Amino acid sequence: MRDPAFPGAAMAYHPFHAPRPADFPMSAFLAAAQPSFFPALTLPPAALGKPLSDPSLAGAAEAGLHVSALGHHHQAAHLRSLKSLEPEEEVEDDPKVTLEAKELWDQFHKLGTEMVITKSGRRMFPPFKVRVSGLDKKAKYILLMDIVAADDCRYKFHNSRWMVAGKADPEMPKRMYIHPDSPATGEQWMAKPVAFHKLKLTNNISDKHGFTILNSMHKYQPRFHIVRANDILKLPYSTFRTYVFPETDFIAVTAYQNDKITQLKIDNNPFAKGFRDTGNGRREKRKQLSLPSLRMYEEQCKADRDGAESDASSCDPAPGRDSLHSPLSTEPSPLRLHRSNREEKFGADSDQELDRREVRTARSHSPVGHRSPPSSPRLEDRGKDKNTPEKKSESPESRKDGGDNVFSRSLEKDKGESRRKEDSKSDPECGSLSKETFAPLMVQTDSPPHLSASHLQSLALSGLHGQQFFNPLNAAQPLFIHPGQFTMGPGAFSAMGMGHLLASMTGASALDNGSLSSVQGATGAATFPFHLSQHMLASQGIPMPAFGGLFPYPYTYMAAAAAAASAMPATSAATTMPRNPFLSSTRPRLRFNPYQIPVGIPPSTNLLTTGLSASLNPGSESSKPGSSRESSPIPDTPGHKRSHSNSLSPKASMKDSINELQNIQRLVSGLESQREVSPGRETPK
């Protein structure tokens, strides 16, 4: 067999078989010495040991056993023979290897080539690429490369040149990088240059990806190997032809030391954009893209300054945000000019700000009366409002408009949103909103799985912003309760001393618990767990008593939400579910909102809109799926019952009224009889 093309002593190749020397010891590829990685194979330091001269010990080397552990030579006869992995018959070939991009390598070599190594792995530039000729066209070859230490010195870059700084650090076992196309025929290898551009260098000694592990500030030499074999498993027993190109040696660094090397890589590597002054980096792209959008933004603000009757929404950054530009003044807010100057000076600081500015610019060309849906997260808008001191100087009109913006965000899925918003501005009952900006009170619950869709459908609190217990609603955050934390039943609140609140609350005097009480009677015990996390309430500013009850005395605005949950109308899933996309799932939702909406709502709107009308309407019994769910335009008064003008018949209306009276009486009487019962368990009536 042909000797390797690089037979120097530095190669440290040692034979297994005495008559025929091979290139690598078996222990380099076995897990007993070091775990082998494919396509990267390990060469442990044991490869530099003394060659095995006795042919009978070759099997012991394969098994990864230490030679001295074998007391007698006859034990090696029991090990598996190597005959099954003998190489193929020799084929006459004379490989020739030339380095691609030799001129570029020479330029780097004159300055002292540096290769950056990182924890995550970094590719080489210039890439190691060779062209092979002289192979047998039919025989299969495996092409691979490795990187070995060029000397035993550690270097440092001092006075614009590399100099020896001391003795080299211990080297990690070197890994062989097998070309991904291996094995392939000689004809395939000779058809095009062989590139090892996917080889990655790392300084992570615990690397699990098969990258080549190098030490920083050490000099290394890449080596190229050709092995004639048709299977990777035959590599340990095959002859390696090794080729070394001295101009490819380099010093591994974690950051470039020589500025000339840095410039040379920038000039030749199309992917080296990190060092360019006028490159296509992310910050440069943002600055270039921000210039036209800033000009359009300034032109729009100038147009707003000229037109005194421009609407606040035409240049509004986001619908949910309080108006930065007062509709009654002709001068823009100082905040707007300040932000414009800041963006001109620094450009966009992040991709998110760039996207937000583009969206704002696109929205500025929308019609005056159009209000687009919100494009930024609610918490982000609220955080910007808290940091805006100029917001306090707004007129009551703009503050009221901001309240409407918050209100429109909570009902953004409704079709008649803009028309209801204009009507609500002229509603005399919304005058109280001009004093303080109320955040919407929203409680969304999902019913437990044992409830059908007809038990919990919709719930409305109408006109409750004028109630006494809704005064603490000037908090900056709406109340959100996770569905799994808030499931309620009618008896849970009456047992907590809240029955009289139901009887006296405006807009909630019409109660219907027919289906709820029937469910309780059927199951024999209350199946409505009442659970609300203490930390959830505390984070929203709701007081929580120490003994574990839900509401302290006096009642807060949560009491009204919880009390009205007992007044849920029982509806039929057959009449409401198909036309309501929001309630198309089998888990009904509840939503509380203190704001009032006019009654003129088309029948096609969803249940949330219908439930938020001027009064709380009672649903029919679950046995009457055809009864109407439309609300009455006549507001409730505490002493009088409202008339059901849109029921199916007077008999159904009278029956509903009787049921309502019975339910109110049952809830009030439950105050005394169920005071000892815990909120989670209630005896059925």
UniProtKB/Swiss-Prot annotation:
Its main location: nucleus. The lineage of its organism: Eukaryota, Metazoa, Chordata, Craniata, Vertebrata. InterPro entries: p53-like_TF_DNA-bd_sf, T-box_DNA-bd, T-box_sf, TBX2/3_TAD, TBX2_3_RD, TF_Brachyury, TF_T-box, TF_T-box_CS. Gene3D superfamilies: Transcription factor, T-box. Residues 652-676 form a coiled coil. Residues 270-433, 606-660 are annotated as: Disordered. Residues 606-617 have a biased composition (Polar residues). Binds DNA as a monomer. Transcription factor which acts as a transcriptional repressor. May also function as a transcriptional activator. Binds to the palindromic T site 5'-TTCACACCTAGGTGTGAA-3' DNA sequence, or a half-site, which are present in the regulatory region of several genes. It comes from Xenopus tropicalis. This is T-box transcription factor TBX2. Residues 104-277 bind DNA.
